[in-house]
Amino acid sequence: ALLKEKKLPFGISCCYTSQNFASISSDEYFDQMVEWGASFVWYFHYMPIGNDAVPALLPTPEQREFMYHKIREARQNKPIFAMDFQNDGEFVGGCIAGGRRYFHINANGDCDPCVFIHYSNANIRDMNLLDVLRSPIFMAYHDGQAFNDNHLRPCPMLENPDKLREMVGKTGARSTDLQS
């Protein structure tokens, strides 16, 4: 309410699963976000990572296609900009991770190519940002883009795991998984 009151732009991040994809893409849900004052909504689909991952929550191809169309429909009909981390790959040329447009820094300062991919050779506490982006795993990401000619299947973990294994092996990146 405070951001809306002060007229500051803000967005909402949503994770859709095989169980909630219809409800969080409904007209009512979009209307609620607009009422709250959100300028944009950023959708991610569930990624089965971590010790307690539930692969059954990963959206099916049909559910991803449903979201593909619902988000484009919302862009045409709702006063909020909707983006989909996976399904908008065709607009951004595939995966945006690895420092191409985005990367993740965990609580220990490890710089991972993506919030979902916990491998690194760089820590922000030990090097500057430019050196992080020049680290072996980030350069492997740079050199490997696009990971798939089909930009709707851009992820080196989910849809192209052979590419991820190759990059980790080639660069000697270590696991930065804070759970295991």
What are these model-predicted stretches?
Residues I96-R100:
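Short, small/polar residue-rich loop motifs at catalytic or cofactor-binding pockets
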